[in-house]
Swiss-Prot record:
The lineage of its organism: Eukaryota, Fungi, Dikarya, Basidiomycota, Agaricomycotina. It catalyses: L-ornithine + NADPH + O2 = N(5)-hydroxy-L-ornithine + NADP(+) + H2O; L-ornithine + NADH + O2 = N(5)-hydroxy-L-ornithine + NAD(+) + H2O. Induction: Expression is induced under iron-depleted conditions. FAD binds at E50, K51, Q52, P53, E54, F55, Q56, W57, H58, Q69, S520, L521, L522. This is L-ornithine N(5)-monooxygenase. It comes from Ceriporiopsis subvermispora (strain B). The gene is SMO1.
Length: 541
């Protein structure tokens, strides 16, 4: 274990786009007209800790020719400060591609170019004094006697634990790959991938399968953008691989009736505007915020860009054309392209590990490990079993790791959290109860409200009450649990129960319940970073 003496003004957990935007806003403060004045965050006392060995951004989904779904103007800084040196236009100018990009006639760069922009921005802020410790994974945070926060991180190569202290903390955990429960029981498995690892793992996966020289069967679970992109990429790859007397098969499995287009029309896109974040945060009830999230769900979740849907339909239409021509000609030649089949209205009922697929290659007598999926129709409840060589899960991300970190830390007690705090509801600080004299109520465990047990999601409001012992017993019998309210400001800062806790802890990318749908997206990075950094400066001595 290694303890580092310097006390940091700010430590950021993670160094993805969210904390990169924070770093950029800090650099602008350092270089701005008020630089060198009282207060603020001291230069060279800012550190970001990142698990990856270098800056990364969704490497598993950097597929060929995939485009961003937002304008390049929604970059790290433009909406906050168009004159910032960290805008996408500044990147293009620095790289000598400004005019060629203009000549493209498109506001949406490729995903590959946007990753290069983010990498350029990371190098730029580091050159201006921001410290980034790559190759370390944060394992815990703890309170310190001097009212600072201890950050414990592990060197991913050596296993050495490093302890650092900070006055303020920004938690930007990103998302952890989420697998269907039945699949997660088998994971890790050499034949199961999450879409977050697809581009970096698919070559190795197909390399282990290709020697079989037989038709491969691969399942893609999900109905969103990642699922569609993975399916199209698999189709392209498998179409060039020999498969014996039948084409390779790709099955898309999803609960919906079809792939649904994302709504990126101008009025709907305003849901991602910073002004809309203000509106959502200040809605009077949690129920109102839930209704807004539900109304605009089709702008972000389980939807596919219309261009991608068109490409998918074109591939499947060509399959029908090939079939018709083959029937007319009586052509029994081996089809050259892989085939995509959709299985709508299906849920995953059961998953099992197959040591060997039933079908073996007659020439080599070899077989491959596989996965057996039992699917269930959501209407008829009818079940069917299918065997696959591999399964790719494009099933989204879990964004609650920050909560587990807090509840397992002694810092959690300052926010009313402990290991038994389940469920937890993130609530705007404007809803903190006030005492009879109008002062803010000292939130504590006594301020629990009651509701049926549910995951960590926005909950319907109920009036604060302290249940009697009989009410507590009855609630437990009915499967109800006390809900712990965790308050957060408009500036993304968690509100402690007591003013005695001085460190400021900010959340990035995980406050959708209070700040709206744009929270986990790139759309408001620059504006959000400005709010956080301004709040840090205002509250720093």
């Amino acid at each position: 274990m290694e303890a580092q003496d310097p006390l940091f003004d700010l430590i950021g957990l993670g160094f993805g786009p969210a904390n990169l935007a924070i770093a950029g806003a800090i650099v602008e403060k350092w270089e701005g007209p008020s630089a060198g004045g009282d207060g603020g965050i001291s230069a060279h006392k800012v550190l970001f800790i990142e698990k990856q060995p270098e800056f990364q951004w969704h490497p598993g989904m950097l597929l060929p020719n995939t485009r961003m779904q937002i304008s390049f103007l929604k970059d790290l800084a433009t909406l906050r400060s168009p004159q910032s040196p960290l805008t996408f236009l500044s990147y293009l100018h620095a790289e000598g591609r400004l005019l060629p990009f203009i000549n493209r006639g498109s506001f949406t760069p490729t995903r590959r170019e946007y990753f290069d922009y983010l990498s350029w921005a990371a190098r730029t802020v580091e050159s201006k004094g921001i410290k980034v410790q790559y190759g370390e994974e944060v394992v815990s945070i703890r309170g310190s006697e001097d009212n600072t926060v201890e950050v414990h991180s592990r060197d991913v190569k050596t296993g050495t634990i490093v302890i650092r202290r900070t006055r303020n903390l920004v938690i930007s955990p990103g998302g952890n790959p989420k697998l269907p429960p039945n699949i997660s029981l088998l994971y890790p498995h050499p034949r199961i991938l999450h879409s977050s690892r697809y581009a970096t793992s698919v070559d190795q996966l197909l390399g282990t399968l290709s020697p079989a020289n037989r038709p491969l069967r691969i399942a893609v679970i999900g109905s969103g953008q990642s699922a569609a992109e993975v399916t199209l990429d698999l189709h392209s790859r498998l179409s060039s691989m020999p498969g014996g007397d039948r084409p390779h098969a790709i099955d898309m499995i999803f609960r919906n009736g079809s792939l649904k287009p994302s709504d990126d029309s101008p009025f709907s896109n305003e849901i991602f505007d910073p002004d809309t974040t203000e509106v959502i945060y200040n809605l009077p009830t949690q129920s109102d915020r839930e209704n807004i999230l539900k109304e605009y769900n089709n702008t972000n979740y389980s939807v596919v860009n219309p261009r991608t849907i068109d490409a998918m339909y074109e591939v499947m239409y060509d399959q029908k054309l090939d079939d018709a021509i083959a029937r007319r000609k009586g052509d029994k030649a081996t089809p050259s392209a892989a085939r995509i089949t959709m299985h709508p209205h299906m849920t995953l009922y059961f998953a099992d590990d197959l040591p060997q697929l039933a079908e073996t290659d007659s020439a080599t007598e070899t077989s491959q490990e596989g996965i057996r999926l039992t699917l269930q129709n959501v209407f008829s409840q009818a079940q069917s079993t299918r065997d696959y060589d591999a399964v790719v899960c494009a099933t989204g991300y879990d964004r609650t790791s920050w909560l587990r970190m807090l509840t397992s830390s002694d810092i959690g007690k300052h926010f009313g959290l402990n290991l038994s705090s389940d469920p937890v509801q993130l609530v705007p600080s404007t809803e903190i109860p006030k005492g009879p004299d109008g002062s803010l109520f000292d939130a504590s465990e006594e301020e629990a409200t009651w509701r049926p047990a549910s995951p960590i999601t926005p909950a319907s409001p109920s009036p604060p009450s302290t249940p009697t012992s009989s009410a507590l017993s009855q609630s437990r019998m009915l499967g109800q649990l006390p809900i712990t309210k965790l308050y957060i400001t408009r500036e993304y800062c968690l509100v402690p129960n007591s003013p005695q806790f001085k460190p400021r802890i900010y959340l990035q990318g995980c406050t959708e319940a209070t700040h709206g749908l744009s929270e986990s997206l790139l759309s408001i990075l620059g504006v959000r970073a400005g709010l956080v950094v301004d709040d840090l400066w205002k509250n720093s001595q």
